[in-house]
Amino acid sequence: MQAEPAFDAKAFCAGLPSQPGVYRMMNSAGQVIYVGKAIDLKKRVSSYFQKNGLAPRTQLMVSQIAGIETTVTRSEAEALLLENNLIKSLNPRYNILFRDDKSYPYVILSGHRFPRLGFHRGPLDKKHHYFGPFPNAGMVRESIQLLQKVFRIRTCEDSVFSNRTRPCLLYQIKRCSGPCVDLVSEEVYAEDARDAELFLQGKQTEVLKSITRKMHEAAEEQEYEQAALFRDQIQSLRKICERQFVDSGRALDADIVACVAENNGGGRVCVNLAMVRGGRHLGDKSFFPQNAEGYDLATVAEAFLAQHYLNRSIPDLIIVGERVPRESLQALLTQQAGHKVIINVNPIGSRRVWLEMATENAALALEQMLGRQASQEERLLALQQALDMTGLSRIECFDISHTMGEATIASCVVYDNFGMRNSEYRRYNITDITPGDDYAAMRDVLSRRYHKIAEGEGNLPDLILIDGGRGQINAALEVMVELGLNDANLVGVAKGEERKPGLEQLIFPGVKKPLQLSKDHPGLHLIQQIRDEAHRFAIYGHRAKLGKARVSSSLEQIAGIGAKRRQSLLARFGGLKGVRTASIEELQQADGISRALAEKIYRELH
């Protein structure tokens, strides 16, 4: 077989155009190892093959180049967009990679006649109003709780709202004004919803004026209880403003991006993103990019801006602590956002203070991450030594969860590169086995998980943990032998005689005596961490499946209740719980339910 000719960099570069575009560098296996953009393709690509001035990391990358492909674009901004689409899809070895697949959450104020306040993640619907995005779900829930306390907006689903006959607990604790049972007029509720919307838009001054006016009007009409309620609203709002608003002058939307590196460069990097919407500081989020070691912080910041805002909501202002190429990034982000986006790399005054705070948070997050990683490295090394293994990195753990054989779920969680990899977790519905047969369930999930690896797709993890004892590990071994994966490293994690944490025994195939590590052994702590996560993930899925099954089965067992009537009942009362608490008269109001059938349903459920 004739060898592939060596890559002739000089000849290749000579034929490149002096135009903007994107280049893809490939190794001898045809894998893309780096994607880059250029204002001038000829100059940029040629610079990689100069004799001096290349960083060691770049030299290593260039030594692996076996081919280069280029795409000419109409502008630098277009090249930047294409570059980052390719980086997202190809995950090249030498590109800085930011992984954050989950979309950001929003507060939603629905378009209902009595608007509902809620948590939303996913596509936006023009019928509703959305506020955010927020950096994490916790900040959304905190905002909802604050808005409930101040404006008493409902949070119940529309199906529950339309079928209530008495106010819920939230009304009793003054977190809802009770529109479901007409305890507040539509006009008054609409005013409260409008004030909540204005507040979320950052127009807190307007909201305070509105509530103050209503307080004075109530006092003049000697409605002192109502006036006191407005007074409490004003006090709560002022406290929130003191804590959350960073720019009381106007409803500012801005992101603040700060970067720090371990040991002032050369090590791990953290990018902290602080979000301000409507003048409110919504919190921050830290990112730890892959392959960023050795790059200067300006390059890291540029990669973050280009990758993070791809197909995401973009604010009017982005404050960055590094000298990034403003013109091309502003052009790209403005095009993406559909409105003008300004990148400020030299903030002054209060905005400089925001950047300093974001930088401090980035440094703190990096310090905490490195501390956790050091602990994980210690645990992983201890486990390697205890198991007499080398090169231990990727661990997968399996658990089975069911209730007396019902709603069986298997979980697989993944530990890799010193941390749990949530995006790689998987749940498996287990059917077609004898209910309660844990061994059959384990055979099923392992066969489904590893059959593609047996066919040559992908690689086995370095270690497979099975939550269970000798029977479970034997079942796992049978599957691996059947699949031809005899070199799989299997370890069973049995709870020990007293089933107490710290007394776990490690079971090995073909080894009669189990291994029991001391309670304070770092390797045991890592196994417990992974096993507990598999257990949690399995139970969560099992409970969801069980709840869904029982909602249907409780009504299905009642003679005369078919799919149509069951759906009518669940829709009217907002679920099985609502059906159970309904009176005979209330049940009778559902479509297709006669008096006799309502009495039968009531008897069966009580």
UniProtKB/Swiss-Prot annotation:
It is found in: Cytoplasm. It comes from the Bacteria. GO terms for cellular component: cytoplasm; excinuclease repair complex. Gene3D superfamilies: 5' to 3' exonuclease, C-terminal subdomain (1.10.150.20), GIY-YIG endonuclease (3.40.1440.10), UVR domain (4.10.860.10), UvrC, RNAse H endonuclease domain (3.30.420.340). One of its GO terms (molecular function) is DNA binding. Interacts with UvrB in an incision complex. NCBIfam families: PRK00558.1-5, uvrC. This is UvrABC system protein C. It comes from Nitrosospira multiformis (strain ATCC 25196 / NCIMB 11849 / C 71).
